[in-house]
Swiss-Prot record:
The gene is rpoB. It comes from Clostridium botulinum (strain 657 / Type Ba4). Residues 1171-1180, 1191-1241 have a biased composition (Acidic residues). This is DNA-directed RNA polymerase subunit beta. It catalyses: RNA(n) + a ribonucleoside 5'-triphosphate = RNA(n+1) + diphosphate. Pfam families: RNA_pol_Rpb2_1 (PF04563), RNA_pol_Rpb2_2 (PF04561), RNA_pol_Rpb2_3 (PF04565), RNA_pol_Rpb2_45 (PF10385), RNA_pol_Rpb2_6 (PF00562), RNA_pol_Rpb2_7 (PF04560).
Length: 1241
């Protein structure tokens, strides 16, 4: 039944029935742990890979001995970095040793390797003052993948791909004649026997003896025209290096370097783990019948007799005693199974080797060699350490390739299984650490080339490590990654939830991933292995659907990058649910039968029912209790954080729940946050982990509290911890970040206690919207098509008011004609316009500004003409005449207004780092209070979104019997067809809870049910169906039917009408077509498109049509004359020829077509060729205006580039691949700057 639960400082009444076992992990540990691994181990791995760098003679040796991040010499704190546009980073210092083998001389130096960006405690990076997030990438794991297709005759064709982390791919395929081919590194296919010969089995007999008798193998040998190893090597060489003279030596070294050289072929730890898992012999011989006696080679005992079935334990024992070939009987045929000869080292060594830290299988022949030659513990350990790269090779080895071929042969006998590439056991995460490591590796390998060159050029006697190392390529590759990688994204900071979700995002796009165009349905689909790992609900709508996902609430990422989810172990003896929690990857989970978390169990953990609903791979079954092995840990483990915040999610349709999850991330922080009456209980955890709230670093007592600082006296040593609170700062998205203390002086706080509320949080719980009294009722058609009718009270009482802060900057640069100057003295500007400008020429804080007002007065020198001798003389005698300057002040853009809240000034003199050529930089921050207004977008948490259509006076709104007017009216028709019934249940429960004074927690899949809601309504004294008589506010008459009324949690979304409304009379024009630009950012016009033209044609409005296509668009002369005529009140002149028509003719002429324009009498009409002729006709100087337009366009473009954040916050691929390299087809004429082609355009 309903019971109180303490959430931070608030008590919620919870309807959950299940006891939660196990804690939810820290929600941003994906980021923190990964970066931590990179600093501790990842960097070292890269240095180990590259050590040592030798010159071409092999005399000089350069080694990286160790490194440290100098955390004491960080220049600025996180806040200062944001203010100064700098990067939050620490210097990386590496200890380098140079050995000269001839002289035996060793030089050691500490070399500075550039500033390395550091992760903040919130899991973000500050790059050039902007807060960015590195999104984790979902990629195919390295490994061996088998696939099967059925051809038109119905025979099964098997294919395989061997994918390394980096290096050459091997692809196997079978054709309908049963011949197996191989492609090496995407080249043309060869019969697979050629590869086998080249690797060492030269003759037909050797191949058949090694791989066993097989029809497909014989067919392939017949097709193969080589007969010896040498011929096979030459054949492969010809395919891979066409045009070069083939020799056996060069062919051998080619294959060696292609596959067996760790520098060029890297499996990575994951690859080795997946190879050993897939190719291990024990999986393929389990439950098969042995065709020969299997004898342990060490002891000689018979493990399995001929004709006996091999069970799982025996199979593992067979593998671990070093047997790599087993004959099994399939349909009266004998088949030889070959493994890759890796064994579990712990089964072969009796003493403790945990200090060696070997978790993987090891290569048996090397281990056997060590065990045969050494006997005592110490020397065996020493040898294992020395030979670790031979025991666990980083590259593929011959045995691996033989095992893959054998697996391919075995599939046609149903030995082994094919793989599903969309299974999360075959997809892994590359998080920050690994992405950074790969980038650092690229930088180091570029540096290695430079070092080698310098070693040969410089004098070997006086050479030093410092002189050899050039850190540029390393620093550049790191900078490039953070600045422009597709996975380094401008953080979505609209509210704390969007911040948290962005850090937990998983993207299949990006370098080495998929591209939107190529991704099919299968990759985007929900897969059974997503359960508890990736949210099946939260993903963007649109072209990225299913490619961008969110991590589930309880999921963790293991050392190999696979996502794991926790399960409770069921005691195998008495079938009791224990509190042991096991984290499992997707392929481990497939081996077990797992019960649901809401399966009824008694207080001792025993199942109440005899039959239990379980998941087994992709099936949902009902099985007896005896078969259950694990149990889910919590009902919300399968969804992400945002989805887990939707109450009654179980009663919503999936597509609406998807919209609900996505829209919560777009909720704007309001002036007074209010936690939801009906919550799900995860709000507190989400807010504390999102990183927007200050927490106590140590336990202690609050000593001082003010609006912008909290001091806590530590219990441990009596020292003081200071916490600065952020006041009215601008977020990345222009919303307002403001923190308010929630502790009082003298309060005792434990470690990790919340000290203050941030944006959109209320007592430490995420509070994205407001609890609003609403009813499902239509009102005079004002809620047609999802529109919303709201009460004036919401405007008057600032219920949905939010603060938005915009940043504008002006810089004074050096120009060719002299420096720009920031000054109050601006030409042709009256005193009225300068009333709020101080003596420096900068607006004062607190001033109220409207669009067009000056923020920073700035003048730029104009070009001066050459002076005559007389003028120069006069100038010298009477002093400087006023210099020619033009006004380039920073003004408030169209449609913006507000109050100046902050001004920051950066100058060279104060030692601020400014870009070259900039002398002074001024930033102004304008804050706006935006009340809710018609046209704003609002939404509930169930995907029920709408636009405000009318603000009604409070007295006209429908009212309840007790006289309270509704605050919002929603259309009842928005519910049934969309099937998001959760909103109705939320409204009923909200009604009862507000009367009872409760805050409620109804967790997803484990919340209040219908009977609970009825009980609450009854307890609160309302009717059980939650409906009430409503009265019309205008007449006082009751409406005909009773209406569902209650409290719904409603959000105001970031799509505000103030940002979208826009109007233009005249403005900038595109350079080539001379048509008005489009879009609000360019101050563009509304496009009168093809279909609109048809409409006017159909209507017969010829003059209107002609006007729209000429003087209102691209008839250059006509539009100037028309404007003049309107101003002077004259008649509008005849339209001329549109510029786009001239462009069309030019394009046709460019295709070598002679195009002439003729009149009725077949006389050629001369079109004006250039803009200059137009100018002559108008007697104006067009040059200046065009340049100004270009300046303006350039500035707009720069600003857009800086903000490279797409408005639709569902899609975070800031820099899409298309933006990086424009396709030639996509370059339209608009992109060409015709000024580069001289005057004759």
């Amino acid at each position: 039944m309903v019971h109180p639960v303490q959430v931070g400082k608030r008590t919620r009444m919870s309807f959950s029935r299940l006891k939660e076992v196990g804690q939810m992990p820290n929600l941003i540990e994906v980021q923190l742990d990964s970066y931590d691994w990179f600093l501790k181990e990842g960097l070292q791995e890269v240095f180990d890979d590259i050590n040592p760098i030798q010159d071409y003679t092999g005399n000089l040796n350069l080694e990286f001995v160790g490194y440290k991040l100098d955390l004491d010499s960080i220049k600025y704190s996180v806040e200062e970095c944001k203010e100064r546009d700098s990067t939050y980073a620490a210097p990386l210092k590496v200890k380098v040793r140079l050995l000269n083998k001839e002289t035996g001389e060793i030089k050691e130096q500490e070399v500075f390797m550039g500033d390395f960006p550091l992760m903040t405690e919130q899991g973000t990076f500050i790059i050039n003052g902007a807060e960015r997030v590195i999104v984790s990438q979902l990629v195919r794991s390295p490994g061996v993948y088998y696939d099967m297709t059925v051809d038109k005759t119905g025979s099964k064709l098997f294919s395989a791909t061997v994918i390394p982390n980096r290096g050459a791919w091997l692809e196997y395929e079978t054709d309908s004649n049963n011949i197996i081919y191989v492609r090496i590194d995407k080249t043309r296919k060869l019969p697979i026997t050629i590869l086998a010969r080249a690797l060492g089995y030269g003759t037909d007999a050797e191949i058949i003896e090694f791989f066993g008798e097989d029809e497909r193998l014989k067919a392939t040998i017949e097709k193969d025209n080589t007969k010896t190893r040498e011929e096979a090597l030459l054949e492969i060489y010809k395919r891979l290096r066409p045009g070069e003279p083939p020799t056996v030596d060069s062919a051998e070294s080619l294959i060696e370097s292609l596959f067996f050289d760790a520098k060029r072929y890297d499996l990575s730890r994951v690859g080795r783990y997946k190879f050993n898992k897939k190719l291990a012999i024990h999986l393929r011989i389990t439950n098969q019948i042995a065709d020969q006696d299997i004898v342990n080679p060490q002891t000689g005992e018979i493990l399995v007799q001929k004709g006996e079935k091999i069970d799982k334990d025996k199979a593992i024992e067979i593998q671990n005693c070093g047997i790599n070939e087993v004959y099994i009987k399939i349909d009266d045929k004998s088949f030889k199974v070959i493994g890759n000869h890796f064994v579990d080292i712990h089964s072969l060594i009796s003493f403790d080797i945990s200090d060696l830290n070997i978790k993987e299988y090891v290569f048996y022949p090397v281990l056997k060699e060590i065990l045969d030659n050494y006997a005592d513990e110490e020397s065996i350990k020493e040898e294992i350490r020395k030979n670790i790269y031979r025991l666990i090779p980083k590259h593929i080895i011959r045995e691996d390739i033989y095992a893959t071929i054998n697996y391919e042969l075995g599939l046609s006998y149903d030995i082994g299984y094919k793989d599903d590439i969309d299974h999360l056991g075959n997809r892994r995460l590359r998080s920050v650490g690994e992405l950074l490591q790969n980038q650092f590796r690229i930088g180091l390998s570029r540096m290695e080339r430079v070092v080698k060159e310098r070693m040969t050029i410089q004098d070997q006697e006086v050479i030093t490590p410092q002189a050899l190392i050039n850190i540029r390529p390393v620093a550049a590759s790191i900078k490039e990654f953070f600045g422009s990688s597709q996975l380094s994204q401008f953080m979505d900071q609209t509210n704390p939830l969007s911040e948290l979700t962005h850090k937990r995002r998983l993207s299949a796009l990006g370098p080495g991933g998929l591209s939107r165009e190529r991704a099919g349905f299968e990759v985007r689909d929900v897969h059974h292995s997503h359960y508890g790992r990736m949210c099946p609900i939260e993903t963007p709508e649109g072209p990225n659907i299913g490619l961008i996902n969110s991590l589930a609430t309880f999921a963790k990422v293991n050392e190999y990058g696979f996502i794991e989810t926790p399960y409770r172990r069921i005691d195998p003896k008495n079938k009791r649910a224990t509190n042991d929690i096991v984290y499992m990857t997707a392929d481990e989970e497939d081996l077990y039968v797992i019960a649901r978390s809401d399966e009824p169990i008694d207080e001792n953990g025993y199942f109440i029912d005899d039959k239990v609903t379980v998941r087994a791979k992709e099936e949902v079954l009902v099985v007896p209790v005896s078969e259950v092995e694990y149990m889910d840990i919590s009902p919300r483990q399968l969804v992400s954080v945002a989805t887990a915040m939707i109450p009654f999610l179980e009663n919503d349709d999936a597509s609406r729940a998807l919209m609900g999850s996505n829209m919560q991330r777009q909720a704007v922080p309001l002036l007074k946050p209010q936690a939801p009456i009906v919550g799900t209980g995860i709000e507190y955890k989400a807010a504390t982990d999102s990183g927007v709230l200050p927490k106590a670093k140590n336990a202690g007592t609050v000593a001082y509290v003010s609006a912008d600082e909290i001091r806590v006296r530590r219990d441990s040593d009596g020292g003081i911890d200071k916490y600065k609170l952020l006041k009215f700062k601008r977020s990345n998205q222009g919303t307002c970040i403001n923190q308010r203390p929630i502790v009082s002086k003298g309060e005792v706080v434990a470690k990790e206690t919340l000290l203050a509320d941030g944006p959109s949080t209320d007592l430490g719980e995420i509070a994205l919207g407001k609890n609003i009294l609403m009813g499902f009722i239509t009102w005079e058609g004002y809620n047609y098509e999802d529109a919303m009718l709201i009460s004036e009270q919401l405007v008057r009482e600032d219920v949905f008011t939010s603060i938005h802060i915009e940043e504008y900057e002006a810089e004074a640069r050096d120009t060719k004609l002299g420096p720009e100057e920031i000054t109050r003295d601006i030409p042709n500007v009256g005193e009225e316009a300068l009333k709020d400008i101080d003596e420096r020429g900068i607006i004062r804080i607190g001033a109220e500004v409207r669009s067009g007002d000056i923020l920073v007065g700035k003048v730029t020198p104009k070009g001066e003409t050459e002076l005559t001798a007389e003028e120069r003389l006069l100038r010298a005698i009477f002093g400087e005449k006023a210099r020619e300057v033009r006004d380039t002040s920073l003004r408030v853009p169209h449609g913006e207004a507000g109050i100046i809240v902050d001004v920051k000034i950066f100058t060279r003199e104060n030692g601020d780092e400014l870009p070259p050529g900039v002398n002074k930089l001024v930033r102004c921050y304008i804050a706006q209070k935006r009340k809710i207004s018609v046209g704003d977008k609002m939404a509930g948490r169930h995907g029920n979104k709408g636009v405000i259509s009318r603000v009604l006076p409070e007295e006209d709104m429908p009212f309840l019997p007790d006289g309270r007017p509704l605050q919002i009216c929603l259309n009842p028709l928005g519910v049934p067809s969309r099937m998001n019934i959760g909103q109705v249940l939320e409204v009923h429960l909200g009604l009862a809870a507000s009367k009872l004074g409760w805050h409620i927690a109804t967790p997803v899949f484990d919340g209040a049910i219908e009977s609970d809601i009825v009980d609450c309504l009854r307890k609160a004294g309302y009717s059980e169906d939650g409906k009430t008589v409503l009265y019309d506010g205008r007449t006082g008459e009751p409406f005909d039917n009773r209406v569902t009324v209650g409290y719904m949690y409603i959000l105001k979304l970031a799509h505000l009408v103030d940002d979208k409304i826009h109007a233009r009379s005249t403005g900038p024009y595109s350079l080539v077509t001379q048509q008005p630009l489009g879009g609000k950012a360019q101050f563009g016009g509304q496009r009168f498109g093809e279909m609109e033209v048809w409409a006017l044609e159909a209507y017969g409005a010829a003059h209107t049509l002609q006007e729209i296509l000429t003087v209102k668009s691209d008839d250059v002369v006509g539009r100037v004359k028309t404007y003049e005529a309107i101003v002077k009140g004259e008649n509008i002149p005849e339209p001329g020829v549109p510029e786009s028509f001239k462009v069309l003719i030019k394009e046709l002429q460019a295709l070598c077509l002679d195009v002439k324009v003729l009149n009725d009498d077949n006389q050629e009409i001369k079109l004006k060729e250039s803009v200059d002729e137009d100018a002559d006709e108008l007697e104006v100087n067009i040059e200046g205006t065009e340049n100004q337009l270009e300046d303006k366009e350039e500035k707009e473009e720069e600003k857009e580039k800086e903000e490279n954040y797409q408005e639709d916050s569902n899609e975070y691929d800031d820099l899409r691949e298309e933006d990086v390299e424009p396709d030639l087809e996509e370059l339209s004429l608009d992109d060409l700057d015709l000024d580069d082609f001289g005057d004759e355009h």
